[in-house]
Amino acid sequence: MLLSDRDLRAEITAGRLGIEPFDDALVQPSSVDVRLDCMFRVFNNTRYTHIDPAKQQDELTSLVEPQDGEPFVLHPGEFVLGSTLELITLPDDLAGRLEGKSSLGRLGLLTHSTAGFIDPGFSGHITLELSNVANLPITLWPGMKIGQLCILRLTSPAEHPYGSTRVGSKYQGQRGPTPSRSYQNFITST
């Protein structure tokens, strides 16, 4: 069940749904707008010949932070990682779904490639997979509305929520745009 504005406010007021910093003006009829943080991860295309999800490639991306008052310019065809300004914390019986903003989509900005789902138990900043499919550069301003977070109530609390040892939660507690940790899926224990 998708939570309405009144249910979202009730969960936040009760302290079960964490959104920090919280601005009540960002609550929509069935979502909460989230804003863009000031850090971005850009891909270094001169260090590696290819991306291998099975290998740890620490120098694949670099952290970039525009100067105060300056935007980040996302060029046509470019893909970077960003993150929400808000720290999101979900209880064991709520899940989230990040969607883009229609107004930005109409300009050619994609907010996430595949990872729009947030598991119950997650706590951290949501990493954004930002792509410019327009034929002109798009300026991304820190603090701008970048997406909307929908919250879904589970039929029962998750038995093993995100963050529990059994799940292997690679991104619990992440701060800022966090690079892929897919290589951890290939590690075999002996």
Swiss-Prot record:
<feature type="active site" description="Proton donor/acceptor">
    <location>
        <position position="129"/>
    </location>
</feature>
<feature type="site" description="Important for bifunctional activity">
    <location>
        <begin position="116"/>
        <end position="117"/>
    </location>
</feature>
<feature type="binding site">
    <location>
        <position position="162"/>
    </location>
    <ligand>
        <name>dCTP</name>
    </ligand>
</feature>
<dbReference type="GO" id="GO:0015949">
    <property type="term" value="P:nucleobase-containing small molecule interconversion"/>
</dbReference>
<feature type="binding site">
    <location>
        <position position="148"/>
    </location>
    <ligand>
        <name>dCTP</name>
    </ligand>
</feature>
<feature type="binding site">
    <location>
        <position position="119"/>
    </location>
    <ligand>
        <name>dCTP</name>
    </ligand>
</feature>
<dbReference type="Pfam" id="PF22769">
    <property type="entry name" value="DCD"/>
</dbReference>
<dbReference type="GO" id="GO:0000166">
    <property type="term" value="F:nucleotide binding"/>
</dbReference>
<dbReference type="InterPro" id="IPR011962">
    <property type="entry name" value="dCTP_deaminase"/>
</dbReference>
<dbReference type="GO" id="GO:0006229">
    <property type="term" value="P:dUTP biosynthetic process"/>
</dbReference>
<protein>
    <recommendedName>
        <fullName>dCTP deaminase, dUMP-forming</fullName>
        <ecNumber>3.5.4.30</ecNumber>
    </recommendedName>
</protein>
<keyword id="KW-0378">Hydrolase</keyword>
<dbReference type="InterPro" id="IPR036157">
    <property type="entry name" value="dUTPase-like_sf"/>
</dbReference>
<dbReference type="GO" id="GO:0006226">
    <property type="term" value="P:dUMP biosynthetic process"/>
</dbReference>
<feature type="binding site">
    <location>
        <begin position="127"/>
        <end position="129"/>
    </location>
    <ligand>
        <name>dCTP</name>
    </ligand>
</feature>
<dbReference type="GO" id="GO:0008829">
    <property type="term" value="F:dCTP deaminase activity"/>
</dbReference>
<keyword id="KW-0546">Nucleotide metabolism</keyword>
<feature type="region of interest" description="Disordered">
    <location>
        <begin position="163"/>
        <end position="190"/>
    </location>
</feature>
<feature type="binding site">
    <location>
        <position position="174"/>
    </location>
    <ligand>
        <name>dCTP</name>
    </ligand>
</feature>
<feature type="binding site">
    <location>
        <begin position="101"/>
        <end position="106"/>
    </location>
    <ligand>
        <name>dCTP</name>
    </ligand>
</feature>
<dbReference type="InterPro" id="IPR033704">
    <property type="entry name" value="dUTPase_trimeric"/>
</dbReference>
<comment type="subunit">
    <text>Homotrimer.</text>
</comment>
<comment type="similarity">
    <text>Belongs to the dCTP deaminase family.</text>
</comment>
<feature type="compositionally biased region" description="Polar residues">
    <location>
        <begin position="171"/>
        <end position="190"/>
    </location>
</feature>
<dbReference type="GO" id="GO:0033973">
    <property type="term" value="F:dCTP deaminase (dUMP-forming) activity"/>
</dbReference>
<comment type="function">
    <text>Bifunctional enzyme that catalyzes both the deamination of dCTP to dUTP and the hydrolysis of dUTP to dUMP without releasing the toxic dUTP intermediate.</text>
</comment>
<comment type="pathway">
    <text>Pyrimidine metabolism; dUMP biosynthesis; dUMP from dCTP: step 1/1.</text>
</comment>
<keyword id="KW-0547">Nucleotide-binding</keyword>
